[in-house]
């Protein structure tokens, strides 16, 4: 992770040399008054990728749970879509935590068994045992405009490469 004060252009006393980023800052436009749309991860990620407030989605508070459905609608463009349209190759690396269309062995989705909100840990654990980990996981970064993805949905999960869990 890199903080705001780690860049030489923002902090002349920074211990980390960032000559290329400093040059970009000098030659381009700098945004120095940013605000987070939320203090937690899911809504902030949603906002950065879509440019929309997360509270306009079906998530009205908190974060998505580990087997939750995709938060970004299939017809909604992300910054990755916009970059690809301009010829860029995009990658998403790290924690996604915006939901996926998790495949279950019985063909359903974990949310089919949950009325509202985050289920209790025992219920989540039970649902996790029914996930088909060998199938493609739809609705993640690859289906939302990114060319490449490597990361986890939530901490302590097996890594996902593209749209499949790794061993």
Residue ranges and their predicted role:
Residues 1-167:
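Formylglycine-dependent sulfatase
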């Amino acid at each position: 992770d890199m903080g705001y004060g780690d860049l030489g252009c923002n902090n002349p006393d920074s211990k980390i040399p960032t000559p290329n980023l400093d040059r970009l800052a000098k030659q381009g436009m700098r945004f120095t008054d940013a605000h987070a749309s939320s203090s937690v991860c899911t809504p902030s990620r949603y906002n950065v990728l879509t440019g929309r407030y997360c509270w306009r989605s079906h998530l009205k508070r908190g974060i998505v749970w580990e087997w939750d459905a995709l938060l970004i609608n299939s017809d909604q463009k992300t910054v990755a879509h916009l970059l690809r349209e301009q010829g860029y190759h995009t990658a998403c690396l790290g924690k996604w935590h915006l939901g996926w269309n998790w495949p279950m062995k019985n063909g359903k989705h974990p949310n089919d068994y949950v009325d509202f909100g985050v289920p209790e840990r025992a219920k989540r654990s039970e649902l996790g045992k029914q996930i088909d980990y060998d199938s493609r996981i739809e609705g993640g970064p690859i289906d939302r405009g990114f060319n490449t993805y490597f990361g986890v949905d939530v901490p302590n999960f097996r890594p996902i490469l593209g749209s499949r869990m790794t061993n």
